[in-house]
A protein has these predicted regions:
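N-terminal capping segments
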Residues: 30-51
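Ubiquitin system architectures
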Residues: 97-100, 104-107
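Short, contiguous acidic and Ser/Thr-rich linear segments
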Residues: 50-56, 127-128
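Short, structured protein-protein interaction patches enriched in aromatics and acidic/basic residues
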Residues: 70-99
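Bacterial N-terminal signal peptides that target proteins for export
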Residues: 2-10
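Bacterial N-terminal signal peptides
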Residues: 11-20
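Active-site nucleophilic cysteine motif
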Residues: 53-65
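Feature captures the catalytic ectodomains and active-site-proximal regions of enzymes
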Residues: 21-26, 33, 41, 66-69, ...
Length: 376
């Protein structure tokens, strides 16, 4: 008995010794814009912050790349000892990527031991508009101190009213295609239409927190989808503190806590659509109780995109429907109003059971959004 126990103790001590003696790893990353490294210690600290991702026992490589400052990725290149440099298309493989605790990268069943990764980013200039620019623009337009937010003003000037029109999942590539397909009679007219970057992960909860606080995810505390409230001040909080009124017109439920008066718009007519009810509720607010700040959230492009795919006829129909609502809302608004229409993220096609569209990857279709500005 004692010999068996001693053998177990020796084996356990040996295992600890071997583990402790394993060299710490560092992943080297480089692009034309950045050269960074990500250490085993950083991995261990970041792993504590994130919930477990299905199929990835470590951390998604998307998370590592975002944390290291990389934004929109076309591909990565790694060195295969047997075949030389090999390139991986990020749109095709990015969602499968995983950095494991031993420093090994996997793409599903494919394993990569290279500790040097070249990141091919899609280049954007330093002055690219960002979703973080919405909060300072809204606050400045209403004459409220921006409190040293990192973003810039998209448009200067002060207004009696500001309206945010939230076009869920209407990414910039989809906006451009809708223009070519003549679906945008109204959303093509504003004088300021700009390409912009959202935040990672490109999902509604995370993007909502970023646009409402003007702070990036790890500063506002909302860096994954399970977090639905921020401790940071939002534009709703600051507008209320300034003695101004705000109202949010939402779909059938809230993706993120807004801390203001909320009007939910369920599918009252049972037509499988909440956007028509969002529109009618918004019109009622504008006519009877127009606040200083109005938030209008259309969910239909996102809902249809997940079900049928972002390039489907159903999404085209939804885009045309929301475009008509945009034109009618503009006509209804009082003078001296600033209107900002925007997407929280885009969407890419997938072939998964029960789903034909998804988002959350560091790719162009997900990360690049339109911001459309109009004044009245």
């Amino acid at each position: 008995m004692n010999n068996k126990l001693n053998n177990k103790v020796i084996w356990f001590i040996t295992l600890i010794f071997i583990t402790a003696c394993q060299p710490a790893w560092t992943l080297q990353l480089k692009s034309d814009r950045l050269t960074t490294s990500f250490s085993q210690k950083e991995f261990q600290e970041l792993k504590k912050e994130y919930s477990e991702t299905e199929g990835c026992p470590g951390l998604p490589l998307n998370v590592i790349l975002d944390k290291s400052g990389y934004e929109v990725i076309d591909s990565i290149i790694y060195n295969n000892l047997n075949r030389g440099d090999e390139e991986i298309n990020w749109q095709e493989k990015g969602e499968e990527s995983c950095l494991n605790k031993n420093g090994q990268i996997s793409f599903g069943s494919q394993k990569i031991d290279s500790k040097l990764i070249t990141v091919n980013e899609i280049p954007f200039g330093p002055d690219i508009t960002r979703i973080l620019d919405i909060a300072p623009t809204v606050l400045s337009a209403l004459g409220i101190d921006k409190e040293n937010l990192p973003g810039k003003n998209i448009l200067e000037g002060q207004f009696d009213h500001v309206v945010l029109i939230f076009l869920d999942a209407f990414g910039y590539s989809r906006y451009q295609q809708a223009l070519q397909d003549d679906l945008l009679e109204n959303l093509s007219k504003p004088s300021l239409i700009t390409m912009a970057l959202t935040v990672f992960p490109a999902r509604t909860t995370v993007a909502s927190a970023a646009l409402l606080t003007g702070l990036p995810p790890f500063e506002n505390g909302v860096y994954e989808t399970g977090i639905r409230k921020t401790e940071a001040d939002t534009i709703f909080d600051l507008i209320s503190e300034a003695g101004l009124a705000s109202i949010a017109v939402e779909g059938e439920s809230l993706a993120f806590s807004l801390n203001t008066e909320v009007i939910l718009s369920g599918d009252r007519d049972l037509n499988g659509n909440t956007d028509d009810n969002v529109f009618s509720n918004a019109e009622e607010v504008i006519k009877s109780n127009m606040p200083n700040f109005l938030w209008i959230h259309f969910h239909g492009i996102d809902n249809s995109g997940h079900t049928y795919g972002p390039d489907s006829k159903q999404v085209n129909d939804k885009i045309a429907e929301i475009d008509s609502y945009f034109g009618k809302i503009i006509d209804s608004l009082p003078d001296n109003t600033l209107i900002i229409a925007f997407a929280d993220h885009g969407m890419h096609s997938v072939n998964e059971e029960g789903r034909s569209g998804n988002h959350g990857n560091l790719i162009y279709d997900d990360m690049v959004i339109p911001i459309i500005v109009e004044t009245k």
